[in-house]
Amino acid sequence: MDEKYTAKNRDKTFVVIEKRFKKNIIHRFSAKRSLFLFTPRNPIRRLAVCIATNVCFDYFLMFTIMINCVFLAMPDISEFAEYIFLGIYTMEMAIKLVAGGFFIDKYTYLRDAWNCLDFTVIMISYITLLLQTINDKVISDITGLRTFRVLRALRTLSIIPGLKTMVNALLRALRMLISVLILILFCLWIFSQAGVQLFGGALRHKCVLQIHGSPAFGKTYDEFYAEHIENSDNWLAKGNGEYVLCGNATGAGPCPTNYTCLPDIGENPNYGYTNFDSIGWSMLISFQLLTQDYWEDVYNKVIRAHSPWTVIYFIVINFFGSLYLMNLMLAVVATAYELEVKNTGKKLQQTAATAREQSLKEQERRNTLTVSEADSHVDDRNCTCCEQCCGCCYNPWLRVQSFAHCIITDSFTEVFIIFIIVLNTVFLAMEHHGMSMELKNVLKVANYVFTTVFVLEAILKLLAFNKQYFKSGWNICDLVVVVASLIDLGVEGLKGVSVFRSFRLLRVFHLAQSWTTMRLLLCIILNTLGSLGYLTIILIIVIYIFAVTGLQLFHTEYTPDKFRGEPVPRWNFNDFLHSFMMVFRILCGEWIEPMYDCMRACNGLCFLIFIPVTVFGKTLFFLFIGLVLGAFGSDTVEQEVEVSSFALPGPESKPCSVRERGISATDDNVKDDGQDEVQQNSEETKIDLRNNDKQSKDGMILENNCNNDSLASLGSLGSIPDIMDGSSVEDDISSCQQKDIQPCLPLFISSRFKCLREFDDTSHGKKWNNFRRQLMMVCENKYFETGVLVIIFASSILLAFEDIYLNEKPRLKLAIFYLDITFCLLFFLEMVLKLVALGFVHYYTHFWTILDFTIVIITVISLAASGLGMEQITAFRSLRTLRALRPLRAVSRWQGMKIIVNALMLSIPSIFNVLLVCVVFWLIFAIMGVQLFAGKFYKCVNETNMRIPPTEVANKIECYNKNYTWVNSNVNFDNVGGAFLALFQVATFEGWMEIMADAVDVTEVDEQPKFEATVYYYFYFVLFIIFGSFFVLNLVIGVIIDKFSFLKKKYDGTYLDMFLTPTQQNYYNTLKKLGTKKPQKTVKRPKNKCQAVVYDLVMSNQFEIFITTIIITNMIFMAFEHYNQSEVVTEVLATANIAFTILYAVEAIIKIIGLRIHYLRNLWNVFDFLVVTLSVMDAFLNDIFGDGIFMNPSLLRVARMFRIGRIIRLIKWAKGMRKLLFALVISLPALFNIGALLMLVMFIYTIIGMSSFGQIKLSGALNDQVNFQTFGKTFLLLVRLATSAGWNDILGPLLIQPPNCDPNYITTSTGEKIKVVNGDCGMPWLAISYMVSYIIIVFMIVFNMYIAVILENFNQAHAQEEVGITEDDLDMFYGVWEQYDPLATQFIKHEQLSDFIQDLDPPLKVKKPNNVAIATFDLPIVKGGHIHCLDILLALVKFALGGNLEETEAFKRVRTQMEARFDEIFPTREKSEIRTSTLQMRREEMAARTLQRAWKRRKIMRSFPSPEMIRYFIISAPETAV
């Protein structure tokens, strides 16, 4: 018995201690009567307690739940089985009720949340049975209640050890998401309202055939016209049956001849679901845009129906919504989970990093031996009984072992094995569809040879290492591959056993034994899988629950009659497999299209599945990815991993050293001297992927060289690189700002000729050098650089005019030609000037100047070719295309962008290293895909490209016999190259639905595909998505983010903070915030009585609450606005808008009256005034030009958008949202530079795309609006492709080849045919290179740079909040400061300091008595006895952080940088004359008091000659407080 908390609540409890897995598990129960019947010692209750705490009971329940989950996955569940499961769960509940009680006392049944879940599910089951018993007809109506049975799967979370703690921590961590979710909903509302105002009804515009003829007898013309436009046969439709959208605004999609664009025709696109007609549908579309799922469809439709300017709306949603909000959610989830795990004190926080490090170190420690140790312990590899059994044969056997040992551990053998592995991989990759018989035989013989080599290697290893062979995981993996290869050879001629061929692909993993990066990556993946085991189980359970829920709700709804005669969609809920794949697809981010199909079948119920799966699934997915990125982050990739003995021996390696691949040593085999040797070798062979780049002065890569200059190996902070002194990286010109100019010629030239060596000393040489110095001054002049930058921009803009219509505009073409010549001459002149000023050595050894030289030469050659009429020659066309690189010259002259580019370029080696490993991983899936699908994606289609059913055409021969076409899919697995392209589409989730559809329909080569003939091939893609995309692709992204963040710090001047201690870093991060705020003047209460009353009103909390209520009410009214609303609704909303506008205007007026000129000091007030002004203008414009006759209706819609700005005012009262938005605000400078880089890259690709693909025939996804024909259309297309949206659809038409195009001629807009190279056909190699490189550079690299900056600032803001000094604390400081310094002089008197720091709120508050603290602050006191606010704040921050700041060199340099920055921000502080300090004054005060006491004693001694009287007086006299 245990009396717990008896002093507080007298709750008596008892505990049962159970031994489980060698641990004592404590179960606590209430000691009161359970169910008011059973005492703790009652036999029945004791039996119940015994059963409830028994591990076998948990196992039985777990087994029951598993079986129940299997039954739940069946569409038709046996009622008898349901009764059995319900009985078991009821029995469990009864046992727990008897053992612990119901709910009154602590530790009873319902006091546990998991038991509440069990109780709820059981009660719902009984209610379902009761309703079914009462009336069998209501069975269909209680399907929703029966669906709750799937929640039983959650019971596994409370049964499986460890999962319960994981889920509890996860639920507590989700609390931090509240602010993010509110911000997302807030922004979603704003985007939705903007969508209603801008695009309401726009997607109903259609091209209608013009009326010909007259109405029939008895019909009016209006009736005839109405019937004509309502007849869908008169609407212009595409080949897929979708109607063509159009618009009447400038730049919108036009209608062809004989068609007219009319509004409000038919329903909206996608079965009426894609529209902005009301706030509900607009919220759905905005959520689709936020998640970037098939958003290119909405993008294309809106631009076509409205105007190209709507791209601004989509850019804002993509950059702010998708890139910031969604990734902020990722950061918050990962951070919150990490914090909760730390708070629980569990070991879960070590699973993502510590486990990997310990595993690698342990493996390295166990698996490395020196030669002497191996020789001395060679006998230990054999069993102890071998010598006794073998007798005289034992010594010869040892010699054979030693011989095999020397062979297998020889460096030549290792190189040979590596060569064989690489060669084997190449031969595996050579397999493709349509191979010749000779190549098949070569590959077959090669497989025999490779298998023989690997078998011999395994035999030699077994001979050499005996029992030690099986102590290495790599050796076991090798043996499995060898055995599988032998089985593959044995069953080579049989069908259906090709699975053994897949094991040959595992030979690629041999490379991991010699390739350190790949080996490290494999170890990371294996350890991460283990550490994320519980989370993976939770993810599977969530998928299972939603899959079963969808199965129970919708499995009878997907019928052909619901889809207007179309076949049932491939993605449905008809069985558990399809439901599982549907939920998996939603988790991968594809939810909108299957939800459209679901809504066609079941209407609104689909929201119950798709939205929760998307939101909750995204949360879990973000947590999963966050932990993966944590495991794959820099701390792992840059781990100082000792290069194992797999690698080639170094200079000190011995030829017969035992390698880990050959032998695993035990701890006893390693001697101390061997350990020292291993440790020494490891120190010499450490690798670091962060700092392996030798760089030039301007930050560009010259070569890669793995060395020991690793940041992680710096033992102290004593030697810090001098490259960063608070400034950025020097550009090419400023790096030469020296007293002496650079040599003009290389040393090997000038040293050979005496005249050149002595030239500088001659009078001509001095004149020449002076001339070069003058040129240097010209080149370094800021006006010269500005002029060059302007010329670069002007010449780049000129490239935008060279579209396919340029030949139809001869004057413009001639003007562009002459301008090109002018710019070319200017660039050539600049090049000559810099070449003379900098010298040949410097000019041709720096990246940016070499780039300038290359672009100038390309321009000269291109112009020469144009002048000679040879521009159509392929070589010159390619050079002309390279002129698109011209904007890159601006990078070296834009310092902010140059920092970004330098950081990016220096990240390339590490990115390439990891990317190469990822390619090897993908190679395995690519080769497997070739083996599974090569030649099987062919199909028989008709003239409309529709696949013929297999019942009509069975194979290729029948297809040709019936005059159909036998075609292959554009993306296929016929060879490894095509497989890589297909896998890239799957990894980016673009076009993967079509690829999977082709894969699961395959039968055999040259046979017609059949619908889901091999449905189990879905799992091939599931495995690739998990390992190839979730793991491997996110590893690349993680390296990009980490490397960019590190190098950006290095080059923007914040590099030194990496050398600071945690306390110093917190102090430094706080200092960076201090410069953002200054004291403000206090708004005094007016003396005029009327103004004073108004002032009191506007400053009261009740007034703010009233205004907030008005704003929320206004937003509710705005939500009722929709397209085609009734006149009554229109009038009510118009009246309400006028009323709200008047209220806002009155608010602004009374605030101006009360606050006077101080009203404009607050930016929120300025924003309010702007919104009020625009709202008043909107009301007047709507009243005067409501019919739109004198004003474009689009302008009215834009004016109405400003009403949405009223809701933004709520942010100033939302503390959580302000913090999240603050992280964005402080990121803006870096984001601006990244955005500029993004625009630069997009501009370059726009010029290249316009030049290379502008003449391609329009087909497929390319149409009159989406194409590469003009700069504007190309740029709009690349904005969409920046998010990888539908890039596969664009790639398809770019691959067009004859006979679908003309390889010799193009057709102009006038119908004229012009002969050009390649005609209107595509160039597949160029199209694939262009598209894939653009996706990699923009989507995977530049976008992740954007994310890296935001996440870094969020993590910094969160870490600063954990420290305790936040923006609100600084606001509080200056708020109190205003009371002591109403005129904002930035100074207060020394006498006020004690009261001031007493009035502050924690953590900056220092309670009285605080005189000692003030003295220790050592604050400078200027003339007049004043102290500056910044000095006080710096001291308080240091005091709040603990005050223990070690004065290291790095910290001193950082503080010097910040002091220089503060001097710029607070000039009055710098100019003030310091007279003393608080510490000095304290010392002077103490000295004065000491003198006073001494003088007092002296006077006493003189007044009282008796010693007793003196002693009595001193003791009895009161002491002055010190």
From Swiss-Prot:
I repeats lie at residues 41-342. It is a multi-pass membrane protein. IV repeats lie at residues 1083-1386. Gene3D superfamilies: 1.10.287.70, EF-hand (1.10.238.10), Voltage-gated potassium channels. Chain C (1.20.120.350). Residues 279-303, 576-596, 977-998, 1271-1293 dip into the membrane without crossing it. Disulfide bonds join C207-C255, C598-C606. It comes from the Eukaryota. GO terms for molecular function: voltage-gated sodium channel activity. Glycans are attached at N248, N258, N942, N963, N1124. III repeats lie at residues 770-1074. It is found in: Cell membrane. GO terms for biological process: membrane depolarization during action potential; neuronal action potential. The keyword Ion transport applies. II repeats lie at residues 393-647. InterPro entries: Ion_trans_dom, Na_channel_asu, Na_chnl_inactivation_gate, VGCC_Ca_Na, Volt_channel_dom_sf. Residues 71-77, 135-143, 202-278, 304-308, 427-442, 492-498, 554-575, 597-607, 798-815, 869-874, 938-976, 999-1009, 1121-1132, 1185-1194, 1259-1270, 1294-1323 are extracellular. CDD domains: Na_channel_gate. The modification Phosphothreonine is found at T1076. Keywords: Cell membrane, Disulfide bond, Glycoprotein, Ion channel, Ion transport, Membrane, Phosphoprotein, Repeat, Sodium, Sodium channel, Sodium transport, Transmembrane, Transmembrane helix, Transport, Voltage-gated channel. GO terms for cellular component: voltage-gated sodium channel complex. The sequence contains 4 internal repeats, each with 5 hydrophobic segments (S1, S2, S3, S5, S6) and one positively charged segment (S4). Segments S4 are probably the voltage-sensors and are characterized by a series of positively charged amino acids at every third position. Mediates the voltage-dependent sodium ion permeability of excitable membranes. Assuming opened or closed conformations in response to the voltage difference across the membrane, the protein forms a sodium-selective channel through which Na(+) ions may pass in accordance with their electrochemical gradient. Belongs to the sodium channel (TC 1.A.1.10) family. This is Sodium channel protein 1 brain. It comes from Heterololigo bleekeri (Spear squid).
